[in-house]
């Protein structure tokens, strides 16, 4: 956002910088993968010739094992998936699109909350070694179920102020740039307002100036960005932190939990299906279904939350009733 149009669209720079930097990450990733080896237990099975000939068949056609696959999906991972996506992606989308929070503020408050919450992945993983995985994940789901709507309602309440029509902007910035391949210009007018109670907001209006006629386009794009006061900003950081804390509770123990559910020779195959469906399908659909519900039932801005809450409720019931909370389980089978 601090780059000029020319710098942003430079042939070898600008928007390409993140992709150039990612080359380093690709190199690190390749190096790590080249140094990785099979787990000691799987290596032992392989040396003894006891690996599965058809892991797909053993995982999904064996009724007892397939039951565990389904239990892992519907009793743990689908809840973990929707809580992950709601606490981060849906929350950010809600702040920007529904609450109209300033783009840069929403990004920075998310980053701060994530930074503070990240160590809790390790904490809950460590604690699950001591007291078991199940109830840490179940408590995380329960907390999310009962607090999502109050948290998102707070987002709405603290950003619910209309843009007045009788107030002059504190400052006005007008920027023009040529549209690529034409002689027409894009006119961007940014106005910053401060309300009597200290609340701030910004409007961005874009118009097209046609070269031939010298006239403005009829169509306009108006963007309203609400700039959060300092107290509200940190309040939102705390609420986002709380939701990501739920993420750490359900996600921190999940890898060890899945490993402990399946025998070594078909472990990776068996745990892959519930993990990827739980996150990719149930979790991945949170933004889409949330938006679909919000546009269909416009009277309730929070209606999109019923999908992740409903999935988490179902997962909590199944997990609480049917999952076992084993500690220090021998996984050498």
Roles of regions detected by a PLM:
Residues 265-295:
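A late C-terminal transmembrane helix in Major Facilitator Superfamily
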Residues 130-141:
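Cytoplasmic membrane-interface "Motif A"-like loop-to-helix N-cap segments
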Residues 65-114, 152, 183-194, 201-203, ...:
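Extracytoplasmic gate region of multi-pass secondary transporters
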Residues 2-21, 221-231, 294-310:
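A membrane-interface helix-boundary motif in multi-pass transporters
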Residues 121-131:
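Helix-to-loop junctions at the C-terminal end of transmembrane segments
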Residues 29-36, 147-158, 310-333:
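Multi-pass alpha-helical transporter architecture, strongest
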Residues 34-57, 332-333:
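Flexible cytoplasmic inter-helical loops of multi-pass small-molecule transporters
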Residues 152-238:
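Low-complexity, proline/glycine-enriched hydrophobic segments characteristic of transmembrane helices
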